[in-house]
Amino acid sequence: MDEKIAKLKEWIDGSDNIVFFGGAGVSTESGIPDFRSVDGLYNQQYKYPPETILSHTFFLSETEEFYRFYRAKMLALDAKPNAAHLKLAEWEREGKCRAVVTQNIDGLHQKAGSKEVLELHGSVLRNYCMRCRKPYPVEDIAKGTGIPRCSCGGIIKPDVVLYEEGLDSYTINKSVDYNSKADILIIGGTSLAVYPAAGLIDYYRGNKLVLVNKSPTPADRRADLVIHAPIGEVFSQL
C-alpha cells in the first residue's frame, strides 16, 4: 500500500485540477454510519426497511414515523470532519482541488472548509416549508418532536433527495462538467451502487482514475490506481 500512496502523492503534487467524488465511507470515520456495509443502516432492524422510510411516499403518508427515524438515525450534528474532509479542504485552498462531489448529506465537507461542494443528495442542514418554502435550520428539526411545522401551518421537509425523487439537474450537470475536465478523479468511500450518482464517473476522460474504498467496487477494473483502505487513513498520509 505504501507504494500506491506514494504514487497518489506524486500525482496530486503535480496537479491543479483534482475532482473528488465521495460517498458514505468518507463520513464513517466521523462516526456517521453508512448504508450498505455490514454494520450499516440497511443491516439494522427497524419496523420498516430504511429504504421504505426514506422514500417520498412514506414521507407523505407516515410523516411522524419518518421523522422519528430521521431524528434518531440521519442527524449527527456533533460529528466532526475527519482527515479526508480536512485534506480536501486543504487541497482546495492550495488551488489543487476544483470540486468535491458528494453523495453525503451531513455537511461535513463545508464544516472542514471546502467551498465548492456539490451535494447530489442534498443536505440535512437545509430544511424548508413545503407550502411557503420558508427555510428552517436543522436545529429546529433536531430539537423538536413529532412533525415539524412552519408558522404558516405547512409541513417542513429536509432538503434531501428521498427515494422516488429525482436529483437536482443543476447539481448533476455541474458535477458532469467538473468530472469531464478533471486531471485526476479520486473516488472515495463509495460502493458505486447508487445510480444515477455512480454513473458520473463515466464522464471522466483522464488517465488518473483513483479508487479508495475499504472493499472492492464495480469500477476497480477501470481505475488506474486502487487502494483498499479507509479513506481517512489514506488521506492522512498524503
Regions found by a protein language model. Name each.
Residues 1-238:
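Conserved catalytic core of sirtuin-type NAD+-dependent deacylases
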